[in-house]
Amino acid sequence: MSEDNRPLEEQLGNRAESPNTPESVREDNSKSQNNHLNQPSSTPQTPETTADNTFVESELLQDSQGIEKLLATLAEQIGSTQEGQEILGQLQPLLTNLIQQNESLLQTNQSLKDQLEEQNQQIDAAKRRYIGLAAEFDNFRKRTLREKEELEKQAKRKTLSELLTVVDNFERARLQIKPSNEGEGEIHKSYQGVYKNLVDSLKRLGVSAMRAEGEPFDPMYHEAMLREPTNDFPEGTVIEQLVRGYLLDDQVLRHAMVKVAAPKEPDSSETESTSESVSDVQQPTT
């Protein structure tokens, strides 16, 4: 078989190993082969960082530059002979095709980078929307919970306020009704049992009675119904509780209606005596 009929790869291989091949051509061939051997078999499946994309672009550019340099070196070294020109004529389309493939890969890589950047922006926007919606939902949940608790408190206060009227009636009946025989005593005792159960139930719900008598008058807890002049209590002291007040969880459920001490007015005789004394002192001398 003649040398011209052998495959191009075999001719190039033999020429690369021939002692007549210039040293620079053999070095370029060796570098080109090593570069291709050192290339990864495939590009990373999913580049996740800018550094990875930059590395891929750098490798592709180096391949293209290496192929162009190899082609220029071959043209310089063996292009002066007829046989070298024939080899270059067969080799140049292959190398040009490799360069075009590299350029196509560079364009594809850039397109993927743009798509990845766009997707990252969409993901960031979606994350911001999610965070905003989550915050709005949390605020809505808290507001709804507060409104629900407030409605429950209002309903509870209204119901308990109605029950306090029943408690007042039981207390008035206990003070006014005096059983005259055993039968009436049993009936009275049964009513008081109902009263006790009602009071115990109110305590379990957080209702407690105020202790107003002897305390300083406080408009936050007391409602003054009467004022009584007296010297037995300091002015502004609650001397009698007319209607019991109640608290619900340390908040006023019903104000206590009370009688408040007022300063006692001086007697008329004392006033006249004091006036005469003042007149005697102020009478001019002649």
Curated annotation (Swiss-Prot):
UniProt xrefs under InterPro entries: GrpE, GrpE_coiled_coil, GrpE_head
Subcellular location: Cytoplasm
Gene3D superfamilies for the chain: 3.90.20.20, Head domain of nucleotide exchange factor GrpE
Gene Ontology CC terms, in alphabetical order: cytoplasm
Disordered, as annotated region: 1-51, 260-286
Alphabetical list of PROSITE patterns matching this protein: GRPE (PS01071)
Pfam families hit by this protein: GrpE
Disulfide bond found in the keyword field: no
Region forming the signal peptide: none
Chain intervals with Low complexity compositional bias: 39-50, 271-286
Keywords: Chaperone, Cytoplasm, Stress response
GO molecular function, one term: protein homodimerization activity
GO terms (BP aspect): protein folding
Listed CDD domains: GrpE
Function: Participates actively in the response to hyperosmotic and heat shock by preventing the aggregation of stress-denatured proteins, in association with DnaK and GrpE. It is the nucleotide exchange factor for DnaK and may function as a thermosensor. Unfolded proteins bind initially to DnaJ; upon interaction with the DnaJ-bound protein, DnaK hydrolyzes its bound ATP, resulting in the formation of a stable complex. GrpE releases ADP from DnaK; ATP binding to DnaK triggers the release of the substrate protein, thus completing the reaction cycle.
Record family assignment: Belongs to the GrpE family.
Subunit text: Homodimer.
Protein name, UniProt field: Protein GrpE
Organism expressing this protein natively: Gloeothece citriformis (strain PCC 7424)
